[in-house]
Amino acid sequence: MSMNENHDIQLVIITGMSGAGKTVAIQSFEDLGYFCVDNLPPSLLPKFLELMKESSSKMSKVALVMDLRGREFFDRLIEALDEMAENPWITPRILFLDAKDSILVTRYKETRRSHPLAATGLPLEGIALERQLLEELKGRSQLIYDTSDMKPRDLREKIVAHFATNQGETFTVNVMSFGFKYGLPIDADLVFDVRFLPNPFYIESMRPLTGKDEEVSSYVMKWNETQKFIEKLVDLLGFMLPSYKREGKSQLVIAIGCTGGQHRSVTLAEYLADYFKKDFYTHVTHRDIEKRSRK
């Protein structure tokens, strides 16, 4: 049996905006048993993978962090990716970490670090240049995580939920609830607006609760509008999800939004994740559930 048959490499390249969580990400992959390397120069990537393939230790899962420090660095990474695409023994995936500019600025201020591309020391200058340099790479990425509203624990859980079971063929359906008042999730593939459904927020006893509470979920689900919407939505998704899987997409992010992300969207997100778990690996997150007011 050839080495190619024995030693295929599952490669995850972690990249994205500085300050978006790459350190937490690489630590998470270490916990999952990946061989991890931080800041490998792109020009060394093909040779590094050849060494991994020929290694007697037979490392099959590799995660690399690649930060950009200029146009030349970026061009070499694109060349390395093009070269890898011709190697049948490598299954590469790019995990791109992003966050809102305001969040990145806040994180830099909290850590008292300077942005690596900010010539004048102003974070926004470096962020703008980095976004420009990363635009093509983001377009090539199989996974894009917006960490704006994530704590380090949340990012770690998201990575573990996806990669602990994903060996290159698993298709993951991530269902997310959110509140429109806090902005659209930038990593969503599909967005559905459920603000037309009756709102438990206006019932005083339910206001401090969420869609994870039985009283709220029963209220949301009892209406004819809800039942008709669910019927049409699961029919649509039942058609779309297998098609996305056949096209080789590794994950799909379905975002369900209501006004505040506490009641209706949470109820529907929980329902959808439970409904499709019999056919797909599903993961549910509630982006804005902790922002609710308990007055």
Curated annotation (Swiss-Prot):
Displays ATPase and GTPase activities. Belongs to the RapZ-like family. The keyword Repeat does not apply. Pfam families: PapZ_C (PF22740), RapZ-like_N (PF03668). This is Nucleotide-binding protein RBAM_031990. The keyword Ribosomal protein does not apply. HAMAP family: RapZ_like. GO terms for molecular function: ATP binding; GTP binding. It comes from Bacillus velezensis (strain DSM 23117 / BGSC 10A6 / LMG 26770 / FZB42) (Bacillus amyloliquefaciens subsp. plantarum). It comes from the Bacteria. InterPro entries: P-loop_NTPase, RapZ-like, RapZ-like_N, RapZ_C. GTP binds at residues 67-70. Keywords: ATP-binding, GTP-binding, Nucleotide-binding. ATP binds at residues 16-23.
